[in-house]
Swiss-Prot record:
<dbReference type="GO" id="GO:0004045">
    <property type="term" value="F:peptidyl-tRNA hydrolase activity"/>
</dbReference>
<comment type="function">
    <text>Hydrolyzes ribosome-free peptidyl-tRNAs (with 1 or more amino acids incorporated), which drop off the ribosome during protein synthesis, or as a result of ribosome stalling.</text>
</comment>
<keyword id="KW-0820">tRNA-binding</keyword>
<keyword id="KW-0378">Hydrolase</keyword>
<comment type="function">
    <text>Catalyzes the release of premature peptidyl moieties from peptidyl-tRNA molecules trapped in stalled 50S ribosomal subunits, and thus maintains levels of free tRNAs and 50S ribosomes.</text>
</comment>
<feature type="site" description="Stabilizes the basic form of H active site to accept a proton">
    <location>
        <position position="92"/>
    </location>
</feature>
<comment type="similarity">
    <text>Belongs to the PTH family.</text>
</comment>
<dbReference type="InterPro" id="IPR036416">
    <property type="entry name" value="Pept_tRNA_hydro_sf"/>
</dbReference>
<dbReference type="GO" id="GO:0000049">
    <property type="term" value="F:tRNA binding"/>
</dbReference>
<feature type="site" description="Discriminates between blocked and unblocked aminoacyl-tRNA">
    <location>
        <position position="12"/>
    </location>
</feature>
<protein>
    <recommendedName>
        <fullName>Peptidyl-tRNA hydrolase</fullName>
        <ecNumber>3.1.1.29</ecNumber>
    </recommendedName>
</protein>
<feature type="binding site">
    <location>
        <position position="65"/>
    </location>
    <ligand>
        <name>tRNA</name>
    </ligand>
</feature>
<feature type="binding site">
    <location>
        <position position="17"/>
    </location>
    <ligand>
        <name>tRNA</name>
    </ligand>
</feature>
<dbReference type="InterPro" id="IPR001328">
    <property type="entry name" value="Pept_tRNA_hydro"/>
</dbReference>
<keyword id="KW-0694">RNA-binding</keyword>
<feature type="binding site">
    <location>
        <position position="67"/>
    </location>
    <ligand>
        <name>tRNA</name>
    </ligand>
</feature>
<dbReference type="GO" id="GO:0005737">
    <property type="term" value="C:cytoplasm"/>
</dbReference>
Length: 189
């Protein structure tokens, strides 16, 4: 069995959540899958996953809802024997303005319940993340209301640019580019 890279987008299933800020991870993974001419289709009760065989990569979206995302990540890690260094979690980040993306190689959950679940199930903070900024000046200051709100029409251009940039970064990661180099390019470029 090849050593896979696992890229997991966090979000919540269902039409009700589809366009919310909290589903930024799903939005990025859907676009990344389409780049490789793939579509997510329920493959497991815990979530959906796809293989990019020629790149030894797995794309995944948990079906466990945000707060239990770690269940699926752990199942995938165990099932496909994926080293922690090859796990990349794509998630919304309320601390960053919409349009900002940042790689993080390890660390705390920063109050993100999906990341808390992944940390709990993997029993470590030692995994990679792509943090996708979703903060808006035009929505509620109440955290739950802000992350569960939909993107406004005035934000759609910024959203599109950020998704495109995220997909480009992840494609380069899948193709073997070093995380440090990607950090330097996308954090400053």
């Amino acid at each position: 069995m090849p050593t896979y890279k696992l890229i997991v987008g966090l979000g919540n299933l269902g039409k009700k959540y589809e366009k919310t800020r909290h589903n930024a991870g799903f939005m990025v993974l859907d676009r990344l899958a389409s780049l490789f001419h793939l579509n997510f289709d329920k493959t497991n009760k815990l979530g959906d996953y796809l293989f990019i065989k020629e790149k030894a990569a797995i794309l995944a979206k948990p079906a466990t809802f945000m707060n239990n995302s770690g269940l699926f990540v752990k199942w995938l890690q165990d099932h496909f024997q994926i080293p922690l260094a090859n796990i990349m979690i794509v998630h919304d980040e309320i601390a960053f303005d919409l349009g900002v993306i940042r790689l993080k190689m390890q660390g705390s959950a920063n109050n993100h319940n999906g990341i808390k679940s992944v940390i709990r199930h993997l029993d470590t903070e030692q995994f990679n993340r792509l943090r996708f900024g979703i903060k808006s000046q035009n929505t509620s200051n109440i955290l739950h209301e802000q992350v569960m709100s939909e993107f406004q029409n005035s934000e759609l251009t910024k959203l599109e640019v950020a998704i495109t940039k995220s997909v480009e970064l992840l494609k380069r990661y899948i193709e073997g580019e070093e995380l440090q180099r990607l950090m330097e390019y996308y954090h400053h470029g």
